[in-house]
Amino acid sequence: MLNSLDLEGRPEDTRVVVAMSGGVDSSVTAALLKSEGYDVVGITLQLYDHGAATHRKGACCAGQDIHDARNVAERLGIPHYVLDYEDRFRESVIDNFAASYASGETPVPCIECNRAIKFGDLLKTARELGASVLATGHYVASRRLADGSRALVCAADADRDQSYFLFATTREQLDYLRFPLGDMTKPEVRELARRFGLEVADKHDSQDICFVPTGRYTDIIGKLRPNAMEPGEIVDLNGRVLGAHQGIANYTIGQRKGLGIAAGAPLYVVKLDVATRRVVVGPREALRTHRITLREVNWIGDGVLDAAVRDGLELFVRVRSTRPPQPAWLRGADGQYEVELVAGEEGVSPGQACVFYDAASGRARVLGGGFIQSAVAESRTTAGLVRPQRVAEPVRG
């Protein structure tokens, strides 16, 4: 007989470590499992210097969050530990974040945090504490497959779905992870928090990059990678100088605002040339992309990746967390993979994730994904000709 976590044994004989951030989602996760009789242990990770962000609304994992997590644990009567992961977080997430921007990319630090810290180090700690599973408050779900392994699927609340940020989760990690909120909506979670008497029931959701207390990510980049803030030229597709900039890290592919140049028609950032410190701008059609190459591809679909894509695999991909999945083809082998976007996409930026799904909507299964290495955009001239050019791949010096 399986319990509610798809495990053998009674809840009271099952230890569960809950990653408690101090927010309403992880707090309700802990409360739900405690109410079902599980042996719950809460762990909060101190990831960075919380001084500047302690009482700022909208900051994830700030000092106030540790206080809130501790209060929730006390109310629930569960053990709670705060682990200092500042050095590890700085090395794995913050340094990589700055290096990625300095290379002309637009990184997604939450993905690396989940991959290296939460589902890497914290999962290992949970095992050492004798836990059968690690539970989190992510809006995503997992389902048992016929062979006993688990699949990652989108959350019931499409507006809160976090599957994009979890594509790098491995099969082994999925077997050990549980997501109790995957079938709930945010309003339902807040209502449960009220029923459990949790003070965080109406707490604001985190909105910013947790380690950027001012909201200005360039402050971090300028400190760790000052070369990314060196001035340079803004040029058009033909190399004509249109203006100057104060650092490539201030720009991302597809950006229109803040260019500081006058033009007869709207211009967008279409390329960041790190070697020459040039920001290349062009018309909107220059952003159109049909083909992207990937690196660090993770596969959690059926079978072996190379066998699945040998003849091309038809699926759906999301190239940005705020955009819906769209039809695509995945091809490649031996670590070299390419995605063909059937309808095309605008503003695809290196460093972002390209996540694979088996459906365009609903409770789609996540098949994996990779980080965008480069994109080939199509610039349509006034004569109606299409000129393919690699405009979104950062040039590293």
From Swiss-Prot:
The segments labelled Interaction with tRNA in the record are 160-162
An example of a GO molecular function for this protein is:
ATP binding
InterPro entries in the cross-refs = MnmA-like, MnmA-like_C, MnmA-like_central, MnmA-like_central_sf, Rossmann-like_a/b/a_fold
Reaction(s) catalysed (UniProt annotation): S-sulfanyl-L-cysteinyl-[protein] + uridine(34) in tRNA + AH2 + ATP = 2-thiouridine(34) in tRNA + L-cysteinyl-[protein] + A + AMP + diphosphate + H(+)
Q: Which residues form the active site?
A: 113, 210
Does the keyword section mention Transcription?
no
BP term (GO), one: tRNA wobble position uridine thiolation
A Gene Ontology cellular-component term? cytoplasm
In its keyword annotation, does this UniProt entry include RNA-binding? yes
Question: Where is this protein found?
Answer: Cytoplasm
- Record site: Interaction with tRNA: 138, 352
Q: List the disulfide bonds.
A: 113-210
Instruction: Give the highest taxon in the source lineage.
Output: Bacteria
Q: Which residues bind ATP?
A: 19-26, 45, 137
Q: Print the keywords alphabetically.
A: ATP-binding, Cytoplasm, Disulfide bond, Nucleotide-binding, RNA-binding, Transferase, tRNA processing, tRNA-binding
**Which NCBIfam families is this protein grouped with?**
PRK00143.1, trmU
| Similarity field | Belongs to the MnmA/TRMU family.
Q: Its biological function? A: Catalyzes the 2-thiolation of uridine at the wobble position (U34) of tRNA, leading to the formation of s(2)U34.
* The protein's name: tRNA-specific 2-thiouridylase MnmA
- The scientific name of the source species is Bradyrhizobium sp. (strain BTAi1 / ATCC BAA-1182)
